[in-house]
Amino acid sequence: MLPSQSPAIFTVSRLNQTVRLLLEHEIGQVWISGEISNFTQPASGHWYFTLKDDNAQVRCAMFRNSNRRVTFRPQHGQQVLVRANITLYEPRGDYQIIVESMQPAGEGLLQQKYEQLKAKLQAEGLFDQQLKKPLPSPAHCVGVITSKTGAALHDILHVLKRRDPSLPVIIYPTAVQGDDAPGQIVRAIELANKRNECDVLIVGRGGGSLEDLWSFNDERVARAIFASRIPVVSAVGHETDVTIADFIADLRAPTPSAAAEMVSRNQQELLRQIQSVQQRLGMAMDYFLANRTRRLTLLHHRLQQQHPQLRLARQQTALERLQQRMNLAIDSQIKRTNKRQVRLLQRLNQQNPQPRIHRVQSRIQHLEHRLAEHVHSRLSAMRERFGNAVTHLEAVSPLSTLARGYSVTTVTDGKVLKKVKQVKTGDVMTTRLEDGWVKSEVKGITSAKRAQKKKPD
């Protein structure tokens, strides 16, 4: 009989550590799908939330260095798909998962892809309204790209038949759902452009979920619509369904039936318009004829008034009056000219310039004589004043003083030597004489004593 073995005894810490290691090493990394609840983000930047389904829930943590790579903001109730490691928080014994990556699940993922493609194409300018092509008015041939068995085609054909039965319609059948649908739609658009049979295209399908309409959110379809030379009207789903094709197309219709109305003419309305135009044209013609008749009568009357014989007679009378006025004007001008000529001759005789010229010449000679005397007198006076000034200037000139035996001595800085304190033994001085300069060196200095004045008693 084998001796009984005592059971292993764990401490709480060791138990939690053992469980954590088992979870982390045995299970490893897993993918989990669930719904987010209790989402929080404290100041640390980490995300804490609960991932649940109908029957269970688990606590989750996603640290900041991982969650900053997530391209969307998680919302309460959102279905997500996460890649995570299973672990145990040892201090409390709480089982939790550490999320490494997160992406929307199901339609959430499709919506994320939709927003990313929309932002990309918008940045490239494919949504620019200035690039939209105008629809022909009226359309002479309509091309329809949709499923040949779908309700959308039935609605389009029904509306076109009701509004404009004579309008040609060319159908380019294609799948509108499934993996092959985007490629078929692209080929149908390219085929319509290659054949160039239509002047407008309707591209669309009936309503459905986001996944059902996903072919019209495909980048290939969007670029094919943008590259189409033929204007494209998008007619995808219902009015609330908005796809990438709606943004790219030259015009968006809320439904396939609305698209058919946009590209077609209402024959009943056209008939009413034609009848209205005919009525207005008849009234305009009646008014035009009546107006022309009145003008013709007026012109006939004016023509009678403007008969050539009458016009010639009036012109002749006017010419005779003008000739008479011209003759009178010429005679009057000749008489005025003769009278003026006589007056000018009389004034000329009265204003003989010879005596006046003699008087002016005599006055000029007298003025010239007086001017010569005045100039001579002024010159004599100025010469006398100049001689006196020269004599006075020579009398006070330093050169005259030097000529009498005096001299002027300057020290090295060029100042005149006035006192013995300006020099010292060894200084060189310059003495100015009448006929030159003498440089000398100071050998000694002797101050002269001034005689002091006695104060009165």
From Swiss-Prot:
It is found in: Cytoplasm. One of its GO terms (cellular component) is cytoplasm. It catalyses: Exonucleolytic cleavage in either 5'- to 3'- or 3'- to 5'-direction to yield nucleoside 5'-phosphates. Its EC number is 3.1.11.6. It is an enzyme of class 3 (hydrolase). The keyword Transcription regulation does not apply. One of its GO terms (biological process) is DNA catabolic process. CDD domains: ExoVII_LU_OBF (cd04489). InterPro entries: Exonuc_VII_L, Exonuc_VII_lsu_C, OB-fold_nuc-bd_dom. The keyword rRNA-binding does not apply. Keywords: Cytoplasm, Exonuclease, Hydrolase, Nuclease. It comes from the Bacteria. GO terms for molecular function: exodeoxyribonuclease VII activity; nucleic acid binding. Coiled coil: none annotated. Bidirectionally degrades single-stranded DNA into large acid-insoluble oligonucleotides, which are then degraded further into small acid-soluble oligonucleotides. Heterooligomer composed of large and small subunits. Belongs to the XseA family. This is Exodeoxyribonuclease 7 large subunit. The gene is xseA.
